[in-house]
Design a protein with these regions (language model features):
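Long terminal segments
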Residues: 191-255
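Beta-turn initiation residues at beta-strand->coil junctions
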Residues: 17-21, 40-44, 62-67, 86-90, ...
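Terminal low-complexity, poorly structured segments
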Residues: 27, 44, 234-236
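Proteins with a high burden of low-complexity, intrinsically disordered sequence enriched in S/T/G/P/A and R
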Residues: 1, 61, 107, 130, ...
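Conserved anchor residues at repeat-unit boundaries in beta-strand-based tandem repeats, strongest
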Residues: 1-13, 25-36, 47-58, 71-82, ...
Length: 255
């Protein structure tokens, strides 16, 4: 049955093609005037095709969002994309879990510039543990909160340097170890991406102890003074600051 429609009327059963003057279209199978079975819909803002039950998408379906230029493919439950699916955006592809058409759970996203995120999502954002590969060759492994590095993580730089420690709001924040080379590293406390407070610098057999502020050394101190300040203010980190370079390298390579 093929008809042109200006309004909704009449009972429909079986295959039907509905055409509206504004360009809307429905093609599929009806039962008691409701779409049941495979159908495709063309609307002003979106296109939709898949398995329907009583006018609602249930089963495999594909949704094209014309306003946001996105395509969703996967399994739908009561009109919502849930479980494993695919989202194709203007400059990225996402493969993973959805709840109500929103990225939730484990997934992998690849951008057109070859940057990649693989890990946990919540409410469409990186949340939890994940790995991000940057186009410049760097990669970050660790915890995320709302698309920003937050918690414990490891930043690997393209020049071979590495930072392992805590982040907040996408910046180094808290205790961290910065590996310059195999025999050179620094143990520092950070604040908003800058070294603050006590720091220990190791280069081979040479060790320096300092106090930092705004990423600059404001005072050099001896080992006894340093350890006493650690005991007074950062006692939980005392054992780490006692490690030698081999122990620190072993720790960083095992994480």
């Amino acid at each position: 049955m093929i008809e042109n429609y200006d309004d909704e009327k009449n009972q429909r059963n079986g295959f039907c093609l509905k055409l509206w003057k504004d360009g809307r279209k429905v093609k599929g199978y009806y039962l008691n005037n409701k779409i049941n079975g495979w159908a495709s819909l063309i609307r002003l803002n979106f296109d939709l095709k898949g398995e329907f039950c009583n006018d609602i998408l249930n089963g495999y379906g594909e949704y094209v969002d014309k306003e946001e230029n996105k395509i969703y493919k996967g399994f739908w439950i009561n009109g919502n994309l849930g479980g494993i699916g695919i989202e194709l955006g203007p400059d990225y592809k996402y493969y993973g879990c959805f709840i109500n058409k929103i990225k939730n759970g484990y997934g992998k996203q690849i951008w057109s510039d070859n940057e990649v995120y693989e890990g946990s999502y919540e409410d469409d954002l990186f949340n939890g543990y994940g790995i991000y590969y940057y186009k410049n060759g760097e990669h970050y492994i660790g915890e995320w909160k709302n698309n920003k590095k937050c918690g414990f993580g490891e930043q690997n730089y393209s020049n071979g340097k590495k930072y392992m420690g805590y982040f907040n709001d996408d910046k180094k924040d808290g205790f961290g170890i910065y590996l310059y080379s195999k025999d050179t590293l620094g143990l520092n406390f950070w604040k908003k991406g800058k070294r603050y407070g006590l720091g220990k610098y190791i280069k081979g057999n040479n060790i320096k102890y300092s106090i930092w502020e705004e990423n600059k050394i404001i005072q050099n101190i001896n080992e006894n003074e340093f350890m006493q300040k650690i005991i007074e203010t950062k006692k939980n980190y005392l054992s780490l600051f006692k490690w030698n370079i081999n122990e620190i390298n072993k720790f960083m390579n095992n994480n």
